[in-house]
C-alpha cells in the first residue's frame, strides 16, 4: 500500500517547485544568460522538481511491489509499464531523469541555453505528472 503521507508531502514540494519555476518562465534568454544567480536558482529548482518526481515514483514502485528499476530513467519506465503514466509523459519524464543526471554528475558541461529551453518546456509535463499521480491515487 502506498504511504499517502509521503506522497502528499512530495507532491506539495513538487507543487512549490513548479510555482517557483512558473514565476521565472517568462525570463528572456539574454537576461537568463546574464544573471548567474538566476541560472543557478532555476537549475537547482528544476533539479529539485525532478528529484521530487523520482521520489514519488520510487515510493509507488516500492509500495506496489513493481519491478526494480535499473536506474533513474527506468523509474519512470516502470511507472509507465504499470499504467500509472501515459506513454508520452513517460518518455518526457525519462528525458528529465537524464537531465537530472547531468545536473548532478556532469554539471561542468551544463549549457545555459539548454537549461533555459528546458524551463520553457517542462512545466506542463511536471504539472501533468503531479495531476496524474493525484488522480491515480485518489488524492484531491
What are the roles of these predicted feature ranges?
Residues 1-140:
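Solvent-exposed interaction patches of small proteins and small membrane subunits
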Amino acid at each position: 500500500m502506498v504511504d499517502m503521507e509521503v506522497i502528499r508531502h512530495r507532491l506539495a514540494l513538487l507543487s512549490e517547485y513548479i510555482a517557483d519555476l512558473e514565476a521565472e518562465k517568462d525570463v528572456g534568454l539574454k537576461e537568463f544568460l546574464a544573471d548567474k544567480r538566476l541560472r543557478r536558482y532555476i537549475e537547482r529548482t528544476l533539479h529539485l522538481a525532478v528529484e521530487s518526481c523520482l521520489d514519488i515514483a520510487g515510493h509507488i514502485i516500492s509500495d506496489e511491489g513493481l519491478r526494480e528499476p535499473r536506474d533513474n530513467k527506468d523509474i519512470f519506465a516502470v511507472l509507465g509499464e504499470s499504467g500509472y503514466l501515459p506513454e508520452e509523459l513517460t518518455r518526457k519524464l525519462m528525458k528529465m531523469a537524464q537531465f537530472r543526471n547531468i545536473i548532478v554528475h556532469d554539471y561542468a558541461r551544463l549549457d545555459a541555453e539548454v537549461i533555459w529551453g528546458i524551463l520553457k518546456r517542462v512545466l506542463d509535463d511536471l504539472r501533468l505528472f503531479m495531476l496524474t499521480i493525484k488522480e491515480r491515487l485518489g488524492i484531491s
